[in-house]
Amino acid sequence: MLKLFSAFRKDKIWDFDGGIHPPEMKTQSNGTPLRQVPLAPRFVIPLKQHIGAEGELCVSVGDRVLRGQALTRGRGRMLPVHAPTSGTVIAIAPHSTAHPSALAELSVIIDADGEDRWIEREGWSDYRAHSREALIERIHQYGVAGLGGAGFPTGVKLQGGGDKITTLIINAAECEPYITADDRLMQDCAAQIVEGIRILAHILQPREVLIGIEDNKPQAISMLRAVLADAHDISLRVIPTKYPSGGAKQLTQILTGKQVPHGGRSSDIGVLMQNVGTAYAVKRAVVDGEPITERVVTLTGEAVSRPGNVWARLGTPVRHLLNDAGFCPSADQMVIMGGPLMGFTLPWLDVPVVKITNCLLAPSVTEMGAPQEEKSCIRCSACADACPADLLPQQLYWFSKGQQHDKATAHHIADCIECGACAWVCPSNIPLVQYFRQEKAEINAIRLEEKRAAEAKARFEARQARLEREKAARLARHKSAAVQPAAKDQDAIAAALARVKEKQAQATQPVVIQAGSLPDNSAVIAAREARKAQARAKQAAHPVADSAISGGDPRKAAVEAAIARAKARKQEQQAGSEPAEPVDPRKAAVEAAIARAKARKQEQQAGSEPAEAVDPRKAAVEAAIARAKARKQEQQAGGEPAEAVDPRKAAVEAAIARAKARKQEQQTGSEPAEPVDPRKAAVEAAIARAKARKQEQQTGSEPAEPADPRKAAVAAAIARVQAKKAAQQQVVNED
């Protein structure tokens, strides 16, 4: 009867399809306790040791850091990394990392000082006094990630679970051959693991907590049972040994009987899974206040003389760990990071240990066997029988090889856990997992490109829609403006139309002239006065510079006005007559001399004191001469062609003009002119008028006799002498 009740109390477990039973090879390393490894002289800490983006750097080259000090900031899925020991940051540069191709990733390189000093640690021994959010934030900021191999940020995983989680599963199966890191951790630190499990349960509040462990770990099972002897909140489930029972989906099915849907997660069925190493890291982060700076790593293989499990600081070079374990490499020695089924071969040994590194396998040549040649698939279906995910590996192989991405996706290649069971049983030695990894990478690249194209298309369509809206709005504005013009535009149009109509009305009105009456020119007079006023205003606004600088000379103004009137009359007469008469050289010479004298006088007056007082007598004489010249030009314009030029007279007049010019230049620099005598001025004006009349009479008399060049030259010389003598006599008289 007792045996019957014991059978009813036995916890039920389930099984999954497929799976294999490879040699375990765990006894090489699980028999010795955990031990510390001497500090390496230099540490390389990659910024990205988890799923997601790398954190933001918060240190610089040359900074001194302590163990546990944050090197990056963690926001969202960006998980921070911490210094594994105290030392100095000597570089922040790309460095080869734990990857099949040893890809270079940005890393912080620290030179250890050997002191291994910690930051100030603050633990929460009473973690129940803190809120769920505070605990999750602490776990995240202390860099805790999944240590079972995935490297998913634990804080993000706990935050995403929320209230949907009904079952918390602790994965202690550790099913892959050679790896004993979790086994040794459970043997040496069972109490700390259980305390970390209780912290996770406090955060999630599930209905049940299950620990799944394979039956090939008797020492670990006994230690956990001893710790859980009086506990009723955690159940320990021992499961049969079969690879890969440690897979998340496979262990969930074994312990709960539920299957995770295709393309889904275990949280979709109310299950959340954590590794025993992660539970231990949670305890150290929350209770002890220690960020994750080290983890347990299995050093095993026949090429290692002292296999076992060690506490390896993150960032320690693989070469340093293997040398500490007595590594004896052969000619073609390989080193595998991870297990023999899911691990990968390292191109060289300078890569650092990261959070997902659980094993370093250094097998001998006889241990792993010689590599065999890949052969063609014989469609034996052994791979399909061994697949724990119920897939068809042979079909996925053909799809991957033929680049048939759609068919590979339709056959759920994303559900492949890359356990390597298919490749283990394949008689043709086909590396199926390598094909599947490459195919999934290509599909991810295609999806990423499609996502970028969709985003670009969405941006383009949004831009086109915006341009169409702007165009429609612009057309609407133009249409409304055409239909309803603005008030000021209407006023301007109306005013313009009124002006046009007024001009048309004025043009069409007949001109009525009454006999015996004067025409009404008031409108014309008003328009002329308006134009004059406008001209005066414009002249006042823009005065002539020379007029503003020096005062006007009435005498010069009178002479220039008379000359201008004469020229105007002459031009009016010439406009309707025959072509202009020949130029009189004598007159041209006289006018040129007078112009030069005036120019010299004006230049001297511009730089000297203000102009001297105007002499009315000289002004009257020059005005009379100008009027006489004007009358003479008028008569010549309407009469016969000009008489022949008399060179003698021209020379005499030129000499007289030059003498007058010299006299004017001398008078410019002398004392102010003497007071003007009105009587003398009147006499000189009368004499000038008489001379002008005489010249007019001579103009209409007999034509001038032909000019004799010799006589003209003699007369010109006599005239020059007389002009000089007259100028000197004038100067003496004035003195």
Swiss-Prot record:
Residues 368-397, 407-436 form the 4Fe-4S ferredoxin-type domain. It comes from the Bacteria. [4Fe-4S] cluster 1 binds at C377, C380, C383, C426. Keywords: 4Fe-4S, Cell inner membrane, Cell membrane, Electron transport, Iron, Iron-sulfur, Membrane, Metal-binding, Repeat, Translocase, Transport. InterPro entries: 4Fe4S_Fe-S-bd, 4Fe4S_Fe_S_CS, Ion_transpt_RnfC/RsxC, Nuo51_FMN-bd, Nuo51_FMN-bd_sf, RnfC_N, Soluble_ligand-bd. Its cofactor is [4Fe-4S] cluster. [4Fe-4S] cluster 2 binds at C387, C416, C419, C422. It is a peripheral membrane protein. It is an enzyme of class 7 (translocase). Binds 2 [4Fe-4S] clusters per subunit. One of its GO terms (cellular component) is plasma membrane. Its EC number is 7.-.-.-. The keyword Translocase applies. It is found in: Cell inner membrane. One of its GO terms (molecular function) is metal ion binding. Part of a membrane-bound complex that couples electron transfer with translocation of ions across the membrane. Required to maintain the reduced state of SoxR. The complex is composed of six subunits: RsxA, RsxB, RsxC, RsxD, RsxE and RsxG. This is Ion-translocating oxidoreductase complex subunit C. It comes from Salmonella agona (strain SL483). The lineage of its organism: Bacteria, Pseudomonadati, Pseudomonadota, Gammaproteobacteria, Enterobacterales. The gene is rsxC.
